[in-house]
Amino acid sequence: MEKLEKLYEGKAKQLYATDDPEVLWVEYKNTATAGDGEKKEDFTGKGRLNNLITTIIFDLLKKRGIDSHLIKRVNDTGQLVRKVNMFPLEIVLRNVAAGHFCSRLGVEEGLPLKEPVLEYFLKNDDLHDPFVNDDDLVALDVCTREDLAEIAPLARKINEALIEIFAKIDVKLVDFKIEMGRATDGTLLLADEITPDSCRLWDQKDHSGKVEHLDKDLFRRGLGSIIPAYEEIEERLAELAKSEGIEVAE
């Protein structure tokens, strides 16, 4: 598969065409950003780790009946994915109060939620990705009621699977954001990535109750380098994947 012209560059990834019109090449960058890109720093090895982590998680989800756009990882920072028509949405699932949820609703970080909260944010840099509801999305022709009737249950199914996956490696899944799109045959697919960039992950190994971040909050809050945390997540996920018979790159 040949990598051709660059189609798009975001904060954390680059997207390239290939010699197959139905396949795209994703390159993971070493850049970390926070605060709508105002805080920015490169971390050597971040792109490699996020490529590995996304590949492992998508493979674990596939074993649990959840399909994604992933075809395969091709090198340290690259992967091949199916071309999908993306919804311009960040789909957020929250299991524990943290981040924007706390500041918006005045609740304490770490509060366990009685049930998972599903939220939508419109992908728009100029508007800082505003919070929107179902009616907003339909009124603005972002998606249809029928789309949402598929998106919501799939998002909740992904949440249940990820809670189980991360619990097996002694990590609490606090919240995460995902994206979805439709393949050319109309199938709704999980797309983009699932990494410590897009999840809040709290280590549970010492059982002390103290919050130890294994995610990008380390960078957002100036708590230290993200690389050791990302390496820890990759190593634990790799061991789990191997135990389930999934081939993992060394």
Curated annotation (Swiss-Prot):
Pathway: Purine metabolism; IMP biosynthesis via de novo pathway; 5-amino-1-(5-phospho-D-ribosyl)imidazole-4-carboxamide from 5-amino-1-(5-phospho-D-ribosyl)imidazole-4-carboxylate: step 1/2
Keyword Nucleotide-binding among record annotations: yes
The UniProt record lists the keyword Protein biosynthesis: no
GO MF, one annotated term: ATP binding
CDD domains from the UniProt entry: SAICAR_synt_PurC
Catalysed reactions, semicolon-separated: 5-amino-1-(5-phospho-D-ribosyl)imidazole-4-carboxylate + L-aspartate + ATP = (2S)-2-[5-amino-1-(5-phospho-beta-D-ribosyl)imidazole-4-carboxamido]succinate + ADP + phosphate + 2 H(+)
Cross-referenced SUPFAM superfamilies: SAICAR synthase-like
EC number: 6.3.2.6
Pfam families: SAICAR_synt (PF01259)
Keywords, alphabetical: ATP-binding, Ligase, Nucleotide-binding, Purine biosynthesis
One of the GO BP terms on file: cobalamin biosynthetic process
Listed InterPro entries: SAICAR_synt/ADE2_N (IPR028923), SAICAR_synt_PurC (IPR033934), SAICAR_synth (IPR001636), SAICAR_synthetase (IPR050089)
Entries under HAMAP family matching the protein: SAICAR_synth
Family according to the record: Belongs to the SAICAR synthetase family.
NCBIfam families: purC (TIGR00081)
Name of the protein in question: Phosphoribosylaminoimidazole-succinocarboxamide synthase
Annotated organism of origin: Bifidobacterium longum subsp. infantis (strain ATCC 15697 / DSM 20088 / JCM 1222 / NCTC 11817 / S12)
Top-level taxonomy: Bacteria, Bacillati, Actinomycetota, Actinomycetes, Bifidobacteriales
